[in-house]
Amino acid sequence: MSLMTKLGFRALVASCLITAGSAANAQVNVLITGVGSTQFPIATANFTNEANLPQQVTSIVRADLARSGKFTNIDAGSTPVPETASVDLGAWKAKGANAFVAGSVNREANGQYKVNFILYDTVKQQSLGGLSLTATDTTLRTAGHKIADYIYQKLLGVRGVFATRLSYVIKTGNRYQLQISDSDGQNARIALSSTEPIISPAWSPSGTKVAYVSFERKKPIVYIHDLPTGRRYMVSDQKGNNSAPAWSPDSNTLAVALSLTGNTQIYTVNANGGGLRRLTQSSSIDTEPFYSPDGRWIYFTSDRGGAPQIYRMPAQGESAGAAQRVTFTGSYNTSPRVSPDGKLLAYISRTGGGFKLYVQDLQTGAANAITNTNRDESPSFAANGQYLLYATQSGGRNVLAAVPSDGSAPPQILSVQGGSVREPSWGPFMQ
């Protein structure tokens, strides 16, 4: 959300319901609107014994690869091919596939499934290995995502993010839902349902907790939701606004924006709610903190120069070193997010009356808009740094979009039927 929107919310009387683990009726749907300029052709044969499964693993693998914009699926026919089969790699190369995947799904005596697959390089005529995964009826989708991750890393040299998760807020009528889903928007679960706004979800580095801001008590308060247990607890309920939680890389601390003394300033608080410490000491508005991946710096938005810009200070606060301005392209920049490798800064810039997602090289300072949308907000990097998830508008609706962080392909739109979806946060690699 915009800087002033996040700071200016007034809460009303709320009624919240924790519903950890309950399935979501409204799920995010992915519309693939564009692909990269260079795609890797791959054929994924049907796995043996998967025809009657609750989830067909190969369908998930193919969909993941297509959704990445990095692959094109070559028709592998309808005949299942197990990982133990002798494969004519030259024939698959002749069909246009530079890689081929074969596999099987076998039900074991305990009711679980054993999912095996092998990946071949048809150009070099060699095996690239495979995995043997254990799954249940409810985790077959995860197995498919893990296979796609393996393929992505072996063929492109970068770890895949298909087995990661998303968090976002869906608004339907007068109800808000904080949902957790697979990276493709499927398998969505409701973490929190409320008649009052929920904003700023932020994943812990471990992927087991989500911090967020709820307005259920007539003011913005920061909570942490523990996903494995469904338990949540209050982290910051200071006087005034409590907003914009951001995790430290070690998961022990949250940076937050508080209006405790008047103007909003940056503080840190222990993940258990104690140890409050003020980091900025300005007479301006300082908000939207975000840690660098090495934990040395906190990036934040401040209007100390007259208009919102991105600044950086030592993680110990301005007492350890003066804040330095980072963004110089554009006169109004907010919502800093640093890539997992620490090399890129994503932010929202007001341009031509709209708001666009920009990415800046932190070494050179070069910054470029990477979207063709014009109402962008809330950027979030994928765990491998190759994609950005953000909120925008499309066809008059509030939607999410995913775009390569280098801007090499158009955004893919993620929408929800009958509602609006905002406040995205892309989770870390699963442990």
Swiss-Prot record:
Coiled coil segments of this chain: none
Keywords: Cell cycle, Cell division, Periplasm, Signal
Pfam families documented for this protein: PD40, TolB_N
Family: Belongs to the TolB family.
Compartment list: Periplasm
Organism: Burkholderia cenocepacia (strain ATCC BAA-245 / DSM 16553 / LMG 16656 / NCTC 13227 / J2315 / CF5610)
Name of the protein in question: Tol-Pal system protein TolB
PANTHER family per UniProt: PROTEIN TOLB (PTHR36842:SF1), PROTEIN TOLB HOMOLOG (PTHR36842)
Region listing for Disordered, in residue ranges: 406-431
Example of a GO cellular component annotation carried by this entry: periplasmic space
Claim: Cell division is one of the keywords in the record: yes
Matches recorded under Gene3D superfamilies: TolB, C-terminal domain, TolB, N-terminal domain
N-terminal signal peptide: 1-26
HAMAP family: TolB (MF_00671)
One GO BP: protein import
Gene: tolB
SS bond partners: none
Complexes and interactors: The Tol-Pal system is composed of five core proteins: the inner membrane proteins TolA, TolQ and TolR, the periplasmic protein TolB and the outer membrane protein Pal. They form a network linking the inner and outer membranes and the peptidoglycan layer.
Main function: Part of the Tol-Pal system, which plays a role in outer membrane invagination during cell division and is important for maintaining outer membrane integrity.
